[in-house]
Amino acid sequence: MSGVWGAGGPRCQEALAVLASLCRARPPPLGLDVETCRSFELQPPERSPSAAGAGTSVSLLAVVVIVCGVALVAVFLFLFWKLCWMPWRNKEASSPSSANPPLEALQSPSFRGNMADKLKDPSTLGFLEAAVKISHTSPDIPAEVQMSVKEHIMRHTRLQRQTTEPASSTRHTSFKRHLPRQMHVSSVDYGNELPPAAEQPTSIGRIKPELYKQKSVDGEDAKSEATKSCGKINFSLRYDYETETLIVRILKAFDLPAKDFCGSSDPYVKIYLLPDRKCKLQTRVHRKTLNPTFDENFHFPVPYEELADRKLHLSVFDFDRFSRHDMIGEVILDNLFEASDLSRETSIWKDIQYATSESVDLGEIMFSLCYLPTAGRLTLTVIKCRNLKAMDITGYSDPYVKVSLLCDGRRLKKKKTTIKKNTLNPVYNEAIIFDIPPENMDQVSLLISVMDYDRVGHNEIIGVCRVGITAEGLGRDHWNEMLAYPRKPIAHWHSLVEVKKSFKEGNPRL
């Protein structure tokens, strides 16, 4: 019988299940044998399809319930550990009864006295400094402890502060005049509880004061280097009236500085008759010598009437075959009639002035000054300019003159002339008037700037000159002559120079 139950496929199983259900019915249907129905009633439970399906469903349900229960228990334990156990442990670790006394105890006089005794111990200084650093981010430390620790650290550092006196300078002295309007540095209030202690200069400032004066020494060295002599040069001048030619004879140079590694130089000389730089003449190169003898003649065709407006420019160079030639120095002879009338040859010795590049002739400007003391009126008349530097690609400039009234390095007023187009020798004859009381004449100066007008872009400065008590050279002499002869126009030619960086920064001197 077991073979009968196990034989067949799914359809046989379904047929057997239908027969079994019919046999279990009461009464059995007609046509069914009683023995056959009894055998179906005695069928093993595991062979019954319905019983097997019911057992499988119960097992799966039990497994699902167990898994869900375990997951819920795990979630509950995790939440309990996160919400209850961790805060309780941190609170117990960070809040012992003896770590932080109550605020009332910190504010008591006995606690402050004990804290002051502990602060006197130098061994606790490192710990206190660390506490001050931590107090900025630690809200648990009381504010009273932070303030007392900071006061002790400040008092201790003031006693150990090193004081040195920096080198005085004119720039700082001039700044002190404007200091009271801003703040009094020496009168800063450090609080009533911390009186300023007497500061004693340390041994560093006494032993090596030159360390603090190094900046001023460097400035003096740079100034002396700019004015030092680089040897001497000997030349002669003579004018040939028949051919209207100026004859310049370069004779020799003496005591030139060494520019090569071997301790010598390869000098030669360039000659210009300014303002014409297109005509450039040059001597031969003399190898490995610091005292060359040139003995060469150079001819410049120029009318005798123009000699007063010409300048002789000599530039001494060191020849270098494989790189740029080094400039040794230069000599500029402003007055060709300085030694004689050029009717006969005259020998001239000049010091070679230190220079790193050839000087550029920017031109000259002629103006007159006239002061009326009774009216307090200063009149500057711009007459003309000559030989201005070409600023445009056309070889010309569009010059105009700007006059600025300065007082203690500050510009009070400025006025301009008209613009002259496409010329290097403009003529203006325009008067510029400033109202200046007589008592203020020693405090003001005039800055005359020759500008090149550009339709597109910024206007460029061709050159400047300055007149006033604080000016130098001809600018000061012209100003003093105007004051000596009031109500009389005093006219002079002034050479234009480049705007120096020191003047841009507010230095009243050019």
Curated annotation (Swiss-Prot):
Database matches in Pfam families: C2
Binding positions for Ca(2+) 2 per the UniProt entry: 260, 318, 320, 326
Positions contributing to Ca(2+) 3 binding: 320, 323, 326
Region (Necessary for cell membrane association (isoform 2)) residue spans: 482-510
Keywords, in A-Z order: Calcium, Cell membrane, Cytoplasm, Cytoplasmic vesicle, Disulfide bond, Membrane, Metal-binding, Phosphoprotein, Repeat, Synapse, Transmembrane, Transmembrane helix
Segments of this protein annotated with the region Cysteine motif: 12-38
SMART domains, per the entry: C2
InterPro entries assigned to the protein according to its UniProt record, in alphabetical order: C2_dom, C2_domain_sf, Synaptotagmin
Family the UniProt entry places it in: Belongs to the synaptotagmin family.
Organism from which the protein derives: Homo sapiens (Human)
Signal peptide range: none
Record topology, Vesicular segments: 1-59
Biased composition (Polar residues): 160-172
Protein name: Synaptotagmin-6
Cofactor binding mode and count: Binds 3 Ca(2+) ions per subunit. The ions are bound to the C2 domains.
Location of the protein in the cell: Cytoplasmic vesicle, Secretory vesicle, Synaptic vesicle membrane
GO molecular function: calcium ion sensor activity; clathrin binding; metal ion binding; protein homodimerization activity; SNARE binding; syntaxin binding
